[in-house]
């Protein structure tokens, strides 16, 4: 059983989480499910308690994303629609029937069923694969590498979320469907990924993007960032060559899909890649060189190892 201090800490934090969530954005069934699952893991026994604590970076990531509903980024800074579109066209524009268009506009008109299928498969990997990779590291007892990966994953997300507030930006599908005037409370849009749903007669992407917390959060593309982090730690962790090759293919596929499906400009993708590399470098060569943070990391590792 956990100590009295641990028990009290977890119960108080969980109660605060549920109360704040209910007050600020409203409780949903997944909040209660997540809280119940965490408490079961924490109190079931020592192995599951270690897992519950190890998963905290991913839990904080999910909570942080959800809580962005409290204060939409467009209430902090103006939304960029035309500026990003025009910059994309000037840097990466392509000619289509004598007209200069963005790559996303080109693919909105020119698309292929095979590409739509692969696009859907790649985009379904962008969160599950990094999380499954982290769990593999954890259960293979490579917990120091796991913890570094999990904390960098969280750190990259926090950098990306900060970017959303610094420069709110509309995705390509918004400019295509709505023009250049920001319309607040615009619902999420499945964009080109809807073709995957249509091919298979499902609503996978419609259910995901219909509940998007904020559509004006295209810069940087965190879709482009996650597999970069996974690939970096697959290399650091000396994973087998076929794992590294698979991660490389998935990473490149997600980058291409982001553009092909009109969810991100090339600029967004490049900034997402930069965000991932910046987060990794700052964590490994900045934070880990600070004694206080290193001590925190070591205590965390000792708890979950």
Swiss-Prot record:
GO BP annotation list:
sphingolipid metabolic process
Where does the chain cross the membrane?
Answer: 41-61, 117-137, 149-169, 216-236, 241-261, 266-286
Instruction: State a GO cellular component annotated for this protein.
Output: membrane
Under the heading InterPro entries, the entry gives:
Aur1/Ipt1 (IPR026841), IPC_Synthase-Related (IPR052185)
Q: Where would you find this protein in the cell?
A: Membrane
UniProt xrefs under Pfam families: PAP2_3 (PF14378)
Query: Which N-terminal residues, if any, form the signal peptide?
Result: 1-23
List lipidated residues, N-palmitoyl cysteine. Answer: 24
The record's keywords, sorted A to Z, are:
Lipid metabolism, Lipoprotein, Membrane, Palmitate, Signal, Sphingolipid metabolism, Transferase, Transmembrane, Transmembrane helix
Q: How does it sit in the membrane?
A: Multi-pass membrane protein
Describe the reaction catalysed, as an equation. N-(2-hydroxy-fatty acyl)-dihydroceramide + a 1,2-diacyl-sn-glycero-3-phospho-(1D-myo-inositol) = inositol-1-phospho-N-(2-hydroxy-fatty acyl)-dihydroceramide + a 1,2-diacyl-sn-glycerol
Molecular function terms from GO: inositol phosphorylceramide synthase activity
For this chain, the annotated S-S bridges are none
Q: Where is the lipid attached (S-diacylglycerol cysteine)?
A: 24
**By its UniProt entry, which PROSITE patterns does this protein fall under?**
PROKAR_LIPOPROTEIN
Function of the protein: Catalyzes the addition of a phosphorylinositol group onto dihydroceramide to form phosphoinositol dihydroceramide (PI-DHC), an essential step in sphingolipid biosynthesis.
The molecule here is called Phosphoinositol dihydroceramide synthase
